[in-house]
UniProtKB/Swiss-Prot annotation:
Protein name per the record: Heat shock protein 105 kDa
Transmembrane segments: none
Gene symbol of the encoding locus: Hsph1
Annotated segments matching region Disordered: 500-585, 801-858
Compartments it resides in: Cytoplasm
Role this protein plays: Acts as a nucleotide-exchange factor (NEF) for chaperone proteins HSPA1A and HSPA1B, promoting the release of ADP from HSPA1A/B thereby triggering substrate release. Prevents the aggregation of denatured proteins in cells under severe stress, on which the ATP levels decrease markedly. Inhibits HSPA8/HSC70 ATPase and chaperone activities.
Amino acid sequence: MSVVGLDVGSQSCYIAVARAGGIETIANEFSDRCTPSVISFGPKNRTIGVAAKNQQITHANNTVSSFKRFHGRAFNDPFIQKEKENLSYDLVPMKNGGVGIKVMYMDEDHLFSVEQITAMLLTKLKETAENNLKKPVTDCVISVPSFFTDAERRSVLDAAQIVGLNCLRLMNDMTAVALNYGIYKQDLPNADEKPRVVVFVDMGHSSFQVSACAFNKGKLKVLGTAFDPFLGGKNFDEKLVEHFCAEFKTKYKLDAKSKIRALLRLHQECEKLKKLMSSNSTDLPLNIECFMNDKDVSAKMNRSQFEELCAELLQKIEVPLHLLMEQTHLKTEEVSAIEIVGGATRIPAVKERIARFFGKDVSTTLNADEAVARGCALQCAILSPAFKVREFSVTDAVPFPISLVWNHDSEETEGVHEVFSRNHAAPFSKVLTFLRRGPFELEAFYSDPQAVPYPEAKIGRFVVQNVSAQKDGEKSKVKVKVRVNTHGIFTISTASMVEKVPTEEEDGSSVEADMECPNQKPAESSDVDKNIQQDNSEAGTQPQVQTDGQQTSQSPPSPELTSEENKIPDADKANEKKVDQPPEAKKPKIKVVNVELPVEANLVWQLGRDLLNMYIETEGKMIMQDKLEKERNDAKNAVEECVYEFRDKLCGPYEKFICEQEHEKFLRLLTETEDWLYEEGEDQAKQAYIDKLEELMKMGTPVKVRFQEAEERPRVLEELGQRLQHYAKIAADFRGKDEKYNHIDESEMKKVEKSVNEVMEWMNNVMNAQAKRSLHQDPVVRTHEISAKVKELNNVCEPVVTQPKPKIESPKLERTPNGPNMDKKEDLEGKSNLGADAPHQNGECHPNEKGSVSMDLD
């Protein structure tokens, strides 16, 4: 089972995997651990990652990048309309009102949703992980910004489903960083001690996030998060682009914004310049050849000028930091360390601002680029049964307060309740109790819309169905469990109606406790149970809110036992004590049964099942097309490689191994094949290239084989000759009565002599015949045949010549009744054969003699 963590960023992606040796960040086919978040569409296939980024300037209209922030947003979203102006590709509205990306693919116009585009990127990451792990990848943990809303998170999960990934958890970036930091720390305070507070700061390509986390041994708790979704390294690049656009317009009379290719080149050069200024404070040049209208442009900038240009952006850094400290009620002296990650934190001015705010140096112990991916892989390993990981619980925080609104039975007034406050622990469940006579609706929304970087405050509308009054006409008690799950998504997980069923108590039967239905999952108990009851014009309509406890993957749920109906009447207790007494007359009893209720969810953003299946099918077809195109290109490259290889070697090492007539014919075929490749063979089916390759190999393989045989033949013949000499010498020694071989039977040795003579005769005949052959003719014998002869000779001779001499048994020792052993004369020979000294008797020990057991002392 694979364990993979995916950091899917706006600009680039990182893949971390868990192995026996720990967590490792893996490289792609270009030996680069960073995979650009870029997809390029061509007439035959898609290009994803590094290869797509290389085509970004030449195929700007069909190359898609910076699409992460489009998840879960409508086309008329103000953010989408603003970003649309800066993109090289077209954004158009989808039928469902979402964002569509229009590109030319397979020589046709195609419209892809953001989920499909992200699925394409995930396909590439999945393929890279599978190539590295050598096994299929299904389970994973994917990172998302902590400020992603419910709709955006659902959109990312849909993208993972399209590509067949089972996302075990959508993990907030900062929580992943905190896990990567804390799980390796051995000096964390104990659970009963004051926790260590660490602030994590992440400035990536497009956003700025901060979080405060409390660490104890074996656990971390996110105290709070703050962010600026529109402040990142991209904004610093844009400041440089704006500056140089104005300079080039004045200096060279060139408007870089009028041509998208020129603007993209300027963006790339400005990003390089920004990185250089992080390590150099001197003036640095910016040179672009043939920028526009065949004109070269040049400019320069230093770090101080850059910081002055970006002063407005640098001031924004402190805003989320102030907000975080206010929300968590922390003081700067309570913060033990400040860990920074993200590519943009390498800018010296950014580091300086953060350090100045906290009054202490920032720490860079984590890998700024890979920390998120490594944290995701650790979380995946914790959730996976295939890995045993040190016990470490993770408690996240809800970034935005969530409220519920509902209509009363009278439909005159509305009830509102905030079920999850800002920075509330997550994952978490709560049980709300309603008194209703019929179905009712609940609407979830974000309580503070101004703090949410998303235009829609509504999360969704949930209809609790099949609710009915009790048989006596009273309102039914409906329990609704609301939950923020491991993905950070709000949902109504279950709803049940408490139904009172009158029954008769049978003789001798024990009284049933009014518990939940056994086939219903028990609710989870909390550390603190609280009941919130507010005054309302209609009695009994305000729900009773029961905190149902935090659910994490590390802590299993425990049964809920707080219901009033669970109390056993005193009369029933008396009956339990009087089991042996004769039964009384039957009396009515009220049995409480929990009935599961269906909940219909109407969410702000969720792909329908039919649409999702269509996207899955489309992605499968594109994957197959990419595979076929790769195989076609591989076949074409094989033909081209074959042409160059044989043409080069026919005038070199292969020249002696082909006759002049065949040489000219083969060269002519190679030239014709090369011309065909660059003309009508430029775009042919895979089979056409396979046929061409077979035609070339039909003429080239015999030449290649003759060359290889000529190279290998002397070596194997020499090996055969050495074995023949070896066995011939042993046979001669045997005939000369050598003591080493006097134990071998003569009939056995005759077999050796016969085999040696036969093989020697065969070798002489072969060598004589081969000497008469020219090099351009096929050899008389192949090297594998000679190797077979060597093996055959060894099989016959080796068992005979390696026969061991029979062992000479040592004579028995004669013992006297009370004296030492008396050895026979032959005992000396026995000792020499055994190679061991006789043991001392009667505990006698002599100095300067070695013991029987040697010990090496360190």
